[in-house]
Design a protein with these regions (language model features):
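C-terminal helical cap and adjacent loop that interface with cofactors, partners, or active-site loops
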Residues: 248-324
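N-terminal Rossmann NAD(P)H-binding glycine-rich loop of SDR-like oxidoreductase domains
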Residues: 3-22
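ADP-ribose/adenylate-binding Rossmann-like module
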Residues: 79, 90-108
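Active-site-lining helix/loop region of Rossmann-like oxidoreductase modules
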Residues: 6, 145-266
């Protein structure tokens, strides 16, 4: 199969490129990025099956020229609020199954529009194939609520989603920018989550970081930088990127943890390598390319991966699912 990977030179894109290039069922992998030099270097370092191309995904006419003969598109482009809808509509117009990292929630109106164009094109798409959203949805669907009667009754309220990460080892500029722009206030630690400092996001989810300099820096963003508006938060994102190498953290801190919690019940996946979101994106794109089912439109991620399949994917990438 032939797969196009958008945002290939970014943090998640690079990890996804490594994983896809190692798969026997991927015969050709096209690494696409605005910085073609980085895409070219990565392609040459990985495998002869890799090609490279440049595209500005913010321009609707840039993508169609790359989609001829393609079986699926995997998009690791961020920030998703700026680019995701345009990417999805372009891929649907080309009749190409598409998986996106989706670092955020697509508005309901946009979701209906995107679902409609993919249905009209007769192909499927999945949005939110990273850590949050992505693994958080798999955890909520398959691990948090077993529905086994009085010992584990269904949750009375939606689960709280969270992403805990090490700023020194996880995420690129687009991700840190979304964190800096999104966090609104300090929040409590969700049940079963790693200890640290947590902050609320507008959609009700939470972002967590280790205690110490990382927690202090995000607290400053919520307090002082927020008063400076958009400019202050843009500066804060750049500052996070520049200084994250000097943010020590407790021994044993995982690179990233995605989790869900309701009351005292929880499910989380611990990612010691920082590539689990990329692994989910890559696996989703391959499954969409193979088209084991003929369902079209936007597909819920938990319908594509059962609980056992999700856990096996985690284990293959050095991660583990923990419930309680």
């Amino acid at each position: 199969m032939k797969i196009v990977l958008l945002g290939a030179a970014g943090f998640t894109g690079r990890a996804a490129a490594v994983l896809l290039s190692r798969r026997d069922d991927v015969g050709e992998l096209i690494l696409v990025d605005y910085d073609i030099r980085d895409a070219k270097r990565l392609a040459k370092a990985l495998s002869p099956k890799c090609r490279w191309a440049m595209a500005d995904v913010g321009k609707p006419l840039e993508l169609p020229r790359l989609l001829a003969g393609i079986d699926a598109v995997a998009s690791a482009v961020g920030p998703c609020a700026e680019y995701e809808k345009a990417i999805l509509l372009s891929c649907a117009a080309g009749g190409i199954p598409t998986a996106t990292i989706g670092e955020g929630t697509i508005p309901a109106e946009d979701r209906r529009e995107i679902d409609g164009v993919f249905r009209d094109a007769g192909v499927p798409a999945v949005v939110g194939c990273g850590m949050m959203p992505g693994w958080t949805e798999l955890l909520a669907a398959h691990f948090l609520d077993a529905g086994d009667g009085a010992m584990n009754p269904p949750a009375a309220a939606p689960a709280t989603r969270y992403l805990f990460f090490s700023p020194a080892r996880f995420g690129g500029y687009a991700f840190l920018r979304e964190v800096a722009k999104g966090i609104t206030s300090a929040a409590t630690v969700p049940a079963g989550a790693p200890s640290g400092n947590y902050f609320a996001m507008p959609d009700g989810s939470r972002i967590g970081v280790p205690e110490g300099k990382a927690g202090t820096r995000l607290g400053w963003i919520v307090g002082t930088a927020a008063k400076l508006g958009v400019v202050g938060k843009e500066f804060s994102a750049a500052l996070l990127l520049w200084t994250r190498g000097g943010m020590p953290e407790p021994a044993g801190t995982p690179v990233a943890v995605a989790g869900v919690a309701t009351g005292d019940r929880f499910a989380r996946v611990e990612d010691p390598r920082g590539n689990l979101g990329a692994a989910l994106l890559a696996e989703t794109a391959v499954r969409l390319a193979a088209r084991p089912r003929k369902t079209t439109g936007l597909l819920p991620l938990p319908e594509l991966f059962g609980g056992q399949e999700a856990e096996e994917l985690a284990v293959r990438n050095g991660a583990r699912v923990v419930t309680g």
